[in-house]
Amino acid sequence: MTIVLLVLGLAAGSYAYANTQHGSDQFGDGPKMAQGAPPDGQGGPGGQGPGGTPPDGKGGPGSSSADIDYSGAVEIASKETESGKTYASTKGDQSALLVATTDEVTITNPTVTKSGDSDGGDNSNFYGLNAGVLVKDGSKTTITGGTINTSANGANGIFSYGGNGGQNGADGDGTTVTIRDTKIVTTGASSGGIMTTGGGTTYAYNLDITTSGQSSAAIRTDRGGGKVVVDGGKYTSNGLGSPAIYSTADITVSNATLTSNLSEGVCIEGLNAITLNNCNLTANNTKRNGNATFLDTIMIYQSMSGDAASGTSQFTMNGGTLTSKSGHVFHVTNTNAVISLKGVTIENKDAESILLSVCADGWQGGSNVATLNASAQKLSGAIKVGSDSQLTLKLTDGSTLNGAIDGKITNAKGSTVSKEVGKVSVTLDGTSTWTLTGDSYVTEFNGNASNVISNGHTLYVNGVALKGVK
């Protein structure tokens, strides 16, 4: 079965580590797949968005048109139930298993192996070419148990492509992958564990995923977005520009262990969202990728590559643990972001102990604006807001902050980013407190001054020392 898709006018760049690369590696070294290199480890298409490549990387502009010939070593084109079968491909740009049907397909205990590199970044990153398992055309496919192993560049483990042609915000064709109790291992670049694009949907339960290549998030999405729901399991990424989760979609993860051993733990690009419920997230971001000039655990940005629509990015975490071994815990740049935390245990092991930075980085064209909502939450560490940036901080329901707010910011390259603080609004409800660890500077303060514990320091509101603090 040969399916030809004409793709028109792809435009994009990538973040510091895009999922794939479009001719240039946004993160720096590494294979030059077709996407651009975003922070999460993805490359950008051959060009770079206004600021260059996006962090986690999503595709960039790509070619003006592309003909995609889909093929699979095994192809399913109608309703099917299979159990205990082996699906293997060693041919470039061929999937081990291609499911292209509007019907329901059920697969139990498969053994999937895929080698043979993809020739093109956009085709493998946006449309599913060369995946271990590719599901498309509106199929409802359920996979239970078994293993999926890929050892090629541009070879995502399982790919749900929703058929919207990479149009962000457009509805997909109903393609839905439900996968549970499966072990997935990928070793090549631009090879995520579970991949969702084009308005596809993925439900994943109790998976064991390990990725090792650049731009290879364990839970990965790209242009056209979609919906991803994960419950249970372990998700580990080891490569450059490869966060545990890279979001250009709506992603909810519950009761899971998420680990990134080189890159950010989570990357959100543009008008997209990640919600973590009772998860344990650990990141050790020790190497910058692409345009990124900071090291961080939660990276929220807009690459302007075209992989994600511009708008408010949202990161929500309820319960669980967040362990940041290197760099800033949260970093917001070139976008508007809302961070909501409730009852999360945060452990910041970095010597500088910076909780949040909102400032310029390696991308341009957007603003640096963040809102941090903390409910029943303990926060500790410095908050840095650049002179061209804005922060709204709200503490409620017995939340506490031990830290200082200022605008003195130096990036991981040692370059000065800001010397003066931007616009900062802080609100404390009657049950929440702020203990200063240094002189702090805000534009607006709402709440009782007595809920601020000076600890020998001064809180300045529009340049005037706040009176009535403890």
Sequence positions of predicted segments:
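Extracellular, surface-exposed repeat architectures
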Residues: 456-470
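Disordered, low-complexity segments in secreted/periplasmic proteins that are enriched in proline
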Residues: 18-67, 164-171, 288, 304-306
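Surface-exposed loop/turn positions within long extracellular repeat scaffolds
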Residues: 420-423, 436-446, 460-461
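Surface-exposed loop/turn motifs in large extracellular/passenger domains
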Residues: 62, 67-84, 99-117, 125-150, ...
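Terminal, low-complexity, charged helical segments
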Residues: 406-407
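Beta-strand-rich domains and repeat architectures in extracellular enzymes and scaffolds
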Residues: 88-99
